[in-house]
């Protein structure tokens, strides 16, 4: 059995393909979705999206929040923004993490602190996507 996965952002279609399984970050934690999953509508949190292809290869994407609808073996994810793990430059991601950590340490005031924490969270998620090791089959 398979799932039809669509990942859409206002700028582009990130994913439109049949898959075996996904692991999705929601506001209440990560959920795994296999064929014949119970229907669900859920908010999507910032975090990784793990995609298991029909050939059992795993890919990673990063979602920057949104909404997901799962029904009748179809998953539609409407995201504010997203990027495929393969599109993330590991060196650039590491540099962004270091900058975010430095900015957090020198943040002053509530607004700067909130912005620095958000930038750090985004940087860590991107690093996680780049460094993720898929489970062995």
UniProtKB/Swiss-Prot annotation:
Assigned keywords, A-Z = ATP synthesis, CF(1), Chloroplast, Hydrogen ion transport, Ion transport, Membrane, Plastid, Thylakoid, Transport
Compartments, as annotated in UniProt: Plastid, Chloroplast thylakoid membrane
Which CDD domains does the record cross-reference, listed alphabetically?
F1-ATPase_delta (cd12152)
Oligomer and partners: F-type ATPases have 2 components, CF(1) - the catalytic core - and CF(0) - the membrane proton channel. CF(1) has five subunits: alpha(3), beta(3), gamma(1), delta(1), epsilon(1). CF(0) has three main subunits: a, b and c.
Which protein are we looking at? ATP synthase epsilon chain, chloroplastic
Please tell me where this protein is predominantly located.
plastid
Q: What protein family is recorded?
A: Belongs to the ATPase epsilon chain family.
- Indicate how the chain sits in the lipid bilayer: Peripheral membrane protein
User: What is a GO molecular function of this protein?
Assistant: proton-transporting ATP synthase activity, rotational mechanism
As for what it does, the entry says: Produces ATP from ADP in the presence of a proton gradient across the membrane.
According to its record, what are the GO cellular component terms? Answer: chloroplast thylakoid membrane; proton-transporting ATP synthase complex
HAMAP family in UniProt: ATP_synth_epsil_bac
